[in-house]
């Protein structure tokens, strides 16, 4: 050891005295000209390159390259950090040095939490998709020369993408209406008396003095006519969201006609008259006398309602009725205004908190019903506008309304109460959709990207909600139209929210799109399937809308205008999907949706939407015809290659629909309308899909049978009262329609009785948590296992497909 240390010392002394040639220092900087031309700079000023070119050398000068942050911004951050460090030194004993143990521990904890979240995710949940929808854009109102904002959930954003691809001089107009679509080649007669009634009227103004309106000078109808109009209006307004009842109105109306105008009941009474006469106007739209009465009562009601200081429960009811009146006139901007005033009064009265002290049971129930009614309207209008929520779910602890025990409320049928109860639950989930998927500050979602984990969590919430529904809202009740009316409405809103989840990924239907090519090959099938889920949800919306429009036409109950807005949004979604896929099968569903809106169009604003839909459909047909003509002109030697998935198993088409591989060899060419008859793009088996029909390359590795199987499924299905093509749930129609063995759908009688007895419970503001076992999507047992199947557990699609494939093999062997 001593000899080794001695030799090392001698070598070090020799090296110290030696003259070792120094290496040339590597220049880490360069002047701007050398950096721009990507040539070597000698590190002098001027450098040889600039000297030869007789240019000004910028070496050792501030760089002219743009920095991501301005110097002022960096200095501002440094000053803020110094200020925070000063506060910490004065008030705490923390060591703020960069190598202090506490600071290093903090960094390690933060890094560990971030990496732990990623590591605990399954590989498929780590997938990040590109969104085609931003969080919102500014649009120009050409009529008034102003700009306005619409968020990502608004139909404005999707229409903006649509008109870029669809020829025909379409434009975004009417920003304050629910139908923001126009066409330069379609002109309407604005002098029509019926249309002039629907032009925006003056709304509440702070400059208008309330004292300038004398209630005694307002002409009112006779007391008998007023009672009749009020009863009809209250039954119309509170048919679904029963925040007010007719039981207390006759006494208050007689007191009002006796000369007692004190309190806030008078503006509420005027708003009820406005809605009642509007109900009669829809049966006779050209009645100018009714139009003048409606304008007069809405005008006075908007100015007499007290929403600033002396407001009460009746003020909130009045504002909510005025909001519904504007909502029915498609003036969603004015509806938003009055709804926000009512929500502000709700918060100031504490209706969002579960306060029971000092109130009777009837008053407590009334407070709950009023708050949850305005809560649902807030979520609906926030979805239409893409605006932030009016009240956060974290600030609410109000209970849901229980089964009423009061004579004034028990007259409302049980199905309406059930619809209201479960509708509130559904709108709670819509809050999660808007905050997790369309909020700029949500986790796992950036300005242009969406995490697959967020989509899966939202899917679990919606599946858990569906599994908790009673049977009356999961299947049509024969001979009970009113119950089916609520069933169709709830299904329509449910699938519109599912469509809202997948809409940002709709561009993945185009397999050659840059977004699809940017994904890894294993993730492309997932993206394509999610885009197909959006089309699937839109088709189910159309089917529910078709049944709902027929029923509404028979009963003249056509005021749930959300159905019309959902129908318009569905048509835009299907047209955009048809543009991407070039599939004429979607034209059938677009036509059905158009007919449903025509059946609901009882006022001129909605009727004016029909020529625009026809114009869009005409432009779409021209594109599909040109695509089909180009496909037919292909040389026979260059016939399109057919992509066949590894498992040609019929999906949700029943065991009787087996796939014959020999028949798949004959490729059917797409066809369009000929001699008034519309034919499908692919009339052959769903297993034969040409690449060129979807603009696909062979190396895309995407099973495009998914889209064709989905369309075939909706064509072959017996009824629409079933889980849709991509959603696997435990439902009774599954056993009837898909012929699933009983061991897969065995129901625990104890669990079933508990579920039936808990249709309406007094629960706090609790949401279906995906971590709870009832809301989770669990894998079902194998086919050979006879364990009873929990009705709240989702059915595994793989087991169903395996069962179908086994039946297909048995049928082929028997044949």
From Swiss-Prot:
Residues annotated to bind DNA: 31-57
Region (Disordered): 646-668, 769-792
Sorted UniProt keywords: Cytoplasm, DNA-binding, Membrane, Metal-binding, Nucleus, Transcription, Transcription regulation, Transmembrane, Transmembrane helix, Zinc
Membrane topology note: Single-pass membrane protein
GO molecular function, one term: sequence-specific DNA binding
InterPro entries (UniProt xref): AtrR-like, Transcription_factor_dom_fun, Zn2-C6_fun-type_DNA-bd_sf, Zn2Cys6_DnaBD
Subcellular location: Cytoplasm; Nucleus membrane
Sequence intervals crossing the membrane: 560-580
Biased composition (Polar residues): 780-792
One CC-aspect GO term: nuclear membrane
One GO biological process term: DNA-templated transcription
Protein name: Uncharacterized transcriptional regulatory protein C530.08
